[in-house]
Amino acid sequence: MTLKKSTSTLLALALVSELIYWGVFTRLFWLKDLYKIIPPVDYAKLTHYSAAGIFAFIAGIIVLFGVYFWLLREKLPAFTPYIPLIFAGTLFFSYPTLAIDLFIYAIRTRGWALYHLNPLLTAPAALPASDPWLKLAAEWINAASPYGPVWEVLSLSVFNPVNGDFLGHLFALKGIAIAAYLLSVWLIGDILSVTHPEWKIWGQVAFAWNPLVLLETAQNAHNDIVMVALLLASVWAMVRGKDHLSLLLLALSVLVKFITILFAPFLIIYLTFKLPTKFHRYTAVVWYIGIFALMVIIPIAPMFPGWDDWAVLQATHGAGRSLMATGVLALEGWLGTNTAFSVMRWTLYGLWAAIVGWRAWQLRTRVNYLDAPIKMGWTVLFWYAALVAPVFHGWYLLWSFSLAVLLGIHSREFLATAVFTLTAMLVIPYFETVRVWYPYLLNNALLGHIIGVSILLLPVLYVIFTTRENVMRET
């Protein structure tokens, strides 16, 4: 297809996508009209668990992903990666129909700004009962923040400019998410302009047009996109040879949400093995570990709640909609719930460690290549979400997807994660609506989870085991 014809088709498909983002995900769900609903609601409740609602959701997702995968096969004009800013602008006004985290961010910041409550130590329940927005915390009312001080300060920074107005703060947090999304798209392009210029536009499009990315950032405003933008900034600095800046940016990412600390060992190994002698490497690894630790510890120290009260550690309790939850449900009748949890944790964490170790062994001769830390980062984050996350959430895929697009749209990493983003969206109506239609699937939690987790993971595993690995050239 010629570029001119491709451009015409692109604009037509952009119009189709915009109509779906507006008609299915925004038109009936204006944030300004719905944000006062207590307790907060989701897509299924807003559409009254209707067949029309579930059909619109599934059809919309399928069409959006159809457009998405079509784009990745075509020659595209340079402005293509930035068309989704229109979609993001539409979703900016939408109620977060897939998760209530946006409200929790705002409530914890209210506690800090108005009542001087440390969000890392204090749950929303500590706010005065008279606070008009307290009940929007819903099931998270007794949970302190599992995030880092960079995120809490960022949320606080937009509280005063809107004079503490709750709706204004929600929109400001959405603005932060969209700004981080735009920064991520630019960083992907600039990284690829150095490592693989021929992939630049497709890499940007692969991230920017992905429906899960757009819905979880522009609509639901998860702070994961801020963490991801800083992770990509760290990779950008690594690619540009700015070693200490790379460590600083990764530390800032960790101080938004702690999961990206899993990338730190691979970044440090790469930076170390660039050096010419063993002496320089040994010295550097001690220096890099020490300085990175200080970059993380010093900012969090004034707000740290103590190990016993740290929400990051408490978040591992319980499980749902995940492989771990399915295993616990299968074993608890024989072993009891606590033992079943222990068995599944040891099993899945062991499998995760084995996969990461095997990948590290495969890449042992490429530790000074730019693709090595990116591939290892993808491996540890992707398989964490797929295997060991006690509760699976679709936005967890932002972590690994941001790295997958840097490895090329024909790579196993990208294809598997792209399919994962599709199944993560399609499984939502099953868990939220279909199981309500058929209460047997709610009452028989094991069967309900087997079906849901199969929808979520089996297509992904098929792609992984049937796709040949591509090897990036040395950069």
Predicted segments — roles?
Residues 2-56, 273, 283-288, 296-384, ...:
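Transmembrane helical bundles and short interhelical boundary loops of multi-pass, membrane-embedded
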Residues 13-14, 61-71, 171-195, 228-229, ...:
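Transmembrane-helix motifs of polytopic, lipid-linked glycan transferases
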Residues 50-54, 149, 153, 163-186, ...:
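Loop-to-helix entry region of an early transmembrane alpha helix in multi-pass inner-membrane enzymes
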Residues 75-82, 185-210:
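Transmembrane-helix signature of polytopic, membrane-embedded enzymes
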Residues 76-178:
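Intramembrane catalytic core of multi-pass membrane enzymes that act on lipidic substrates
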Residues 175-179, 195, 204-232, 237, ...:
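Multi-pass, polyprenyl lipid-linked donor-dependent membrane glycosyltransferases
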Residues 214-217, 233-237, 244-268, 379-387:
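Membrane-interface alpha helices of multi-pass inner-membrane proteins
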Residues 263-293:
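Perimembrane helix-loop-helix junctions
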